[in-house]
Every structure is written in structure tokens, then in C-alpha cells.
A protein has these predicted regions:
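Polybasic low-complexity intrinsically disordered regions
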Residues: 1-87, 136
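A broad, low-specificity signal marking well-ordered, structured residues that form hydrophobic/aromatic
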Residues: 16, 103, 133
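A generic structural signal for residues located within well-ordered alpha-helices
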Residues: 37, 41, 100, 127-130
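Helix-centered, glycine/charged polyanion-binding patches within enzymatic domains
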Residues: 54-126
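Charged phosphate-binding loop/patch that engages nucleotide di/tri-phosphates or the phosphate backbone
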Residues: 132-148
Length: 148
């Protein structure tokens, strides 16, 4: 899952792209190599949602790594309203009291990191690592929905 890239010199590791609901419950997870840009995994992450979505459009909060016209177009095509903070907008919105929503995904990443098997990747095959990430997501969903 890693390969040479002239900008980060073949950075090693794995990146988890997670789509969550407003409570931080994972709806979709895609893993890529650490040297893969976020833009390349955005459509795969949106397409891998397995729960049935409502017919009305839903809000989709994205960070600056997804600030591309292609991402906005693809998310609109999938009935999402993209909210991407463009460069320089973040400081202005903080001044007027706009609530940050990025912490929801960061908390979900923290929940993933509590599973020691995911914190440091020992698995050689990406399928095995994805299975462990999905198992962790199942436990997070169980704790979030069933246990409240």
C-alpha cells in the first residue's frame, strides 16, 4: 500500500479515510497508502457507505485536503451538501462563533487508536488490516448505538 512519490519520498504507512455521522459513528472506512492524496480516496469513501441514506440532501463537512472542485462535484452528485473550509476562511469563521465540526471525526480516529492492533500496523496484507479496522468500527457502532 505504499509506493514512491516525489513529494513525500515514498512515505510509509496507512491512512484511514472515515465518514461518520454527527455522533461519530463510522459509516464508511477506506484505507490507502500514506503517500496517497485525500482527493483520490474521497469518492471511494462516499461510495462505500453501506447504510441506506435518506432522499433529502445531507451535509458533508470536509477538511482542506478535500478542497477541490472534483470533490465538490462528486459529493453533490451523491446528494451531499459539501462544506469545505477554504484557505483563510477558518480564522474568519472562528471569530464569528461558527462551531467547528472536525472534532467528531478526530474523536472517531481516537476511538480507532484505542485498539492496539490498529495503532501500529503489523499486518502485511491490506485486506487483513481493513478487516481489523472494520471489526473496530463494529465495536464502535455497538458501543455508540446499543450501549448509548
Amino acid at each position: 500500500m505504499t509506493g514512491p512519490n516525489p513529494t513525500d519520498r515514498g512515505k510509509r504507512g496507512t491512512k484511514r479515510h472515515v465518514l461518520t455521522d454527527k455522533k461519530g459513528i463510522p459509516l464508511s472506512v477506506v484505507i490507502t497508502a500514506a503517500n496517497t492524496h485525500d482527493m483520490k480516496a474521497a469518492t471511494d469513501t462516499l461510495d462505500s457507505v453501506i447504510v441506506e441514506r435518506p432522499l433529502k440532501k445531507q451535509n458533508l463537512c470536509l477538511d482542506k485536503g478535500y478542497d477541490f472542485p472534483e470533490i465538490e462535484r462528486e459529493s453533490t452528485k451523491r446528494r451531499y451538501i459539501p462544506h469545505i473550509l477554504h484557505r483563510g476562511e477558518e480564522k474568519e469563521l472562528i471569530k464569528i462563533g461558527y462551531p467547528a465540526r472536525r472534532w467528531v471525526v478526530e474523536r472517531t480516529n481516537s476511538w480507532h487508536n484505542r485498539f492496539r492492533k490498529l495503532l501500529i500496523r503489523y499486518e502485511k496484507k491490506s485486506e487483513n488490516y481493513l478487516a481489523l479496522v472494520c471489526l473496530a468500527c463494529c465495536i464502535i457502532v455497538y458501543r455508540g448505538i446499543i450501549l448509548g
